């Protein structure tokens, strides 16, 4: 695995493209690029702009991004904004001709996607072929609505087929079943999306909307967090998780080195960030490696609501903690030793599941704090979220509630829904089994 290749991003649906706005705003700031794709600073030798950007013939930088939606509002808004109107390659944008969206219906999004999939895949493959060495694809979407879940599911199938050896990492926004949502059929959309998330990506970063709102409300001191608040948190997760590749880390120079899924298909990743700061307020805390590490490892810090319900058998399967800022190497080693005893791993697993490392900061952006961190955590503690959503699905399905919304879609069969439910249940069984001593020998 020598050398470092490039990454491209695919953003699908309203939520996926709203995340694109926040993520790419962070990327241009962190790489010293203005809204016209021009550099604003002298290049730093550790700044690998070409990981996520390419240079056009006039040398301005262009995001290696593909934007997809079945209705035009969000993408049109981006392209009319001063931050993005001259940044993206308009040939990499797909919007449906009819512009009617998918009506928050997975079946509609999936079946409409079948009609336009070749056009979208032509864009993605062309962009990939313009890259000398593609390492992976970052994919943003929601699993609750119609386009992000349905069209997103279809594109994940096609991406895996087209790029069998590339890393596919999704940032998937979930609507927690314990909270209200304006999408009454979201448990159906979720279970159908989950099958494709189980079968296709290498990693799925689970972003629970309820947990994101709770964190934003507490840290930004508002009862009604905005999309900007929520999306800034997700952009921070995406930014920090890619920082080692973007700024020349020797410890983790490529997404191909990220070993987060030793037991596939258990590749669903929780995340936590610290500190969370309102950019409009003065930051008065003193940060340290020990303080940030302690916060990141608290179950209540995870971006998954049910993570606060600690279960005695839950195990960490694999995790990475990226620490940024003014840090001496020995403090990371000390912190790693101090937390190792508190981490529960599967009884058959001898390796340390947590790897802690220093991740470089952008040379062009000065943070408000001296030390910050991100935890990417593959733990069995994510299973209660899936159990909760599957229970909600079972209740709706047993009553055939809102099933007519799916039955009226051409080329959709309810067998697809039932098959997906069984695949999700198999995943939950796997989470229960992996904490047992005989996990590796069962069935032999």
Swiss-Prot record:
One GO term in the molecular function aspect is: GTP binding
According to its UniProt entry, the protein's GO biological process terms are: cytoplasmic microtubule organization; detection of temperature stimulus; maintenance of centrosome location; meiotic spindle organization; microtubule nucleation; mitotic cell cycle; mitotic sister chromatid segregation; mitotic spindle organization
Where is the protein localized? Cytoplasm, Cytoskeleton, Microtubule organizing center, Centrosome; Cell junction, Hemidesmosome; Cell junction, Adherens junction
Q: Write out the transmembrane intervals.
A: none
Pfam families for this protein: Tubulin, Tubulin_C
Keywords in alphabetical order: Cell junction, Cytoplasm, Cytoskeleton, GTP-binding, Microtubule, Nucleotide-binding
Function noted in UniProt: Tubulin is the major constituent of microtubules. The gamma chain is found at microtubule organizing centers (MTOC) such as the spindle poles or the centrosome, suggesting that it is involved in the minus-end nucleation of microtubule assembly.
UniProt record similarity statement: Belongs to the tubulin family.
UniProt protein name? Tubulin gamma chain
Q: Which organism is it from?
A: Caenorhabditis elegans
